[in-house]
Amino acid sequence: LMPLLQMPHPHNDGGYAVEDFDTVDPALGTNKDLENLTRELRKAGISLCLDFVMNHTASTHRWAMAAKAGDPWFQAYYHLYDDRTIPDQYEQTVPQVFPNTAPGNFTWCEEMHKWVLTTFHDYQWDLNYANPAVFVDMTKSILHLANLGVEVFRIDAVPYIWKQLGTTCRNLPQVHTIVRMLRMVLECVCPAVILKGEVVMAPKELAAYFGTPEKPECHMLYNVSTMVNLWGALASRDTRLLKAQLDALHALPDNCWFVNYLRCHDDIGWGLDEAVEKRLSIDPQKHKEYLYHFYEGNFPGSWAKGELYNYDPATGDARSCGTTASLCGIEQALEKDDKTALDYAVKRDLLLHTAMAFLQGFPMLNCGDEIAQLNGWDYKNDPDRVEDSRNLHRSKFNWEDAKQRTRKGTLQNQLWQGMEQLRQMRADPCFAPDAWV
């Protein structure tokens, strides 16, 4: 599930600005509701995975409020500076996450008369893990949620949690120490709980977050690289990058388990392996620009309908937004009432899901993909959501379309039956973890 802990309203980055790590947001229910949900899911053989935001709190979290009030204990929970001397030094080496909508990495707090490190949005204050109290309190919250029945934690923005001057503040060695410490605590207290790392970084950085067989860190990671290469291969009709990436994946040790997916709540960041691209005589920048324009629908012959996210004209960088169905061409084909185009779009959709389903690891189906849910362009009419194009693929689930999944001949039925066939094939013993191939 997406973040459901107490958050400020309306500005909460989709729940990734947390006011209270121990309490379900009142708009969604209570802690008792969460406990009842995990119990019912477990009866059905389902483990609940919950987002846990490690890097920051909301600026309205009680720790932040105490810091604003001048409490030195809680001011030490954050990175605070009286003037721009150190922040300016950080800015020389630390990239910006949202250069257009939230430029810079620091925010001025008038109540404290201090600068606050805010990697993401100005209302998300980065925690200071150099303070042991931060690790202790965050670990307590994870254990509290585990006691409510959460069995898998998707630890968010892990590569960012350690800050050091003169670096990019990404993927630093101390990050791995902290994740290792968290894994050790969980193995002692609740050994069945799983850590799933959200590491949206260059391919060369990914494997380190598994740790080693002797010193494990995350149990699983999102397979960002394969996801990006699948979309890249579909648009370019060139599988060389995908093959190179899969070859590298299969060479990883046995302790490396990935969650394979096509779409999620986030954008598609075109983090392809530039060294491999150059070896294949592919211009990395031009290739990236081609891909994000293609999936924007802004390239001759493109079947996709999507939007750019976080476009930076200075670097030419951008990411892509849209649902699987819309990016595969289903939305455009329906608009044009083109049956041939629709048939091809459905085949693209099922092709990607087939590739994803039979990779080593755990296939993850994004909610709505099973009924070909389209982009939700109505977000542009919501003043609280219009600034973030990721809301294009964050629509409410379309229950009316879901009813069509059992009606033979409907678009929804085509996708539903295709997914069911993949599920049955994946359940075959030949795909068991201990199967010999």
What name fits each language-model region?
Residues L1-V437:
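Active-site and adjacent substrate-binding regions of carbohydrate-active enzymes
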